[in-house]
Amino acid sequence: MKLLPAAALLAALLPVLAPAAPTLTVTVANPLAAPRAAETITVPWTAVARALPGALLQHLEVRDAAGRVLAYQVTNVAPNARDPQNVGAGYGDLIFQHDFAAGEAAATFTVVRAEAVAPVFPARVFARFVPERYDDFAWENDKIAHRTYGPELAAPDTAHTGKEVATESGLDVWSKKVSYLIVDRWYNKGGSHYHKDEGEGMDMFDVGKSRGCGGTGIWDGRTLATSGNFATWRVLANGPIRAVFELTYPAWEAHGRRVAEVKHFTVDAGHNLDELESTFTDLDGRPDPLTVAIGLTKDSADHGQEGRSEYAAVPDDGSETVWE
């Protein structure tokens, strides 16, 4: 029998005795029986840092129960935050997605540190300020795109150049026929082209003075008081899975009181609907509540197109729909 030196024997045993790498296990419950595609899962980064001390956002691996590596994103909504104890205070959430099959009651995922730098995952959401088009702000995912209107569009044409002037705070819709990102492509080709379908979809939505798709206002029972164009913008996260941004609307007159608004948008990949939170401030400090209305344009045909839309209210949940 050949005897191994003690050092060699110790080296042979080390792989067996080495402690398992730290792992964060995430289990998500699904109470619905219906299939749910592209469900977004968020894990506070503080939980990641607690389970994986010293974890770096670009050195992670997220796997599902089948061992498939998933695309992920780490938000940083407080870019000036300090994290001297390295507990994850500087970051927001770890984000990834899962397609729940019909009847899938739960799903489990593992998050581990990785030696290699994580790949650059394809972006499926995008949001940006568009100064080259009168200060628009545009956003999209792989399903649909939107835009709204900024201060330069509302500015007067003092130079008499024929500049378009409009006060419009509704939300526009760009209908996409492709899953890749198109906002930059469409702005590059110009409005005379993106109002026609050239293969990728089109802007077929006429906002005008309406609320468009989800715009807001203050209702007094008879008339709707609406803001002007947004004044400032701030992007908090920008893909590849989730985009988050805010638009601020300065004070306007709403039935005898001054009101300001901040819109907070959350745009997720794979979703037909965005999440929009509006915060209204009564600048006069009156105690009586504001009645906020949310609008949806019934007849949205644009640029002489034939409008074909079907409006329906759903009393059970208070929602409204317009099918184009």
What is each PLM-predicted segment?
Residues 261, 273-307:
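Acidic (Asp/Glu-rich), glycine- and aromatic
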Residues 298-324:
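Accessory, usually C-terminal, subdomains that scaffold auxiliary metal cofactors
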Residues 112-203:
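Beta-strand-rich N-terminal accessory domains
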Residues 32-37, 47-52, 68, 144-148, ...:
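Primarily extracytoplasmic ectodomains and periplasmic/lumenal surface modules that are beta-strand-rich
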Residues 21-127, 134:
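Alpha-mannosidase-like glycoside hydrolase catalytic domains involved in N-glycan trimming
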Residues 184-269:
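Extended, loop-rich substrate-binding clefts of extracytoplasmic carbohydrate-active enzymes
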Residues 6-16:
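Bacterial N-terminal signal peptides
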Residues 1-5:
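Positively charged n-region of N-terminal signal peptides that target proteins for export
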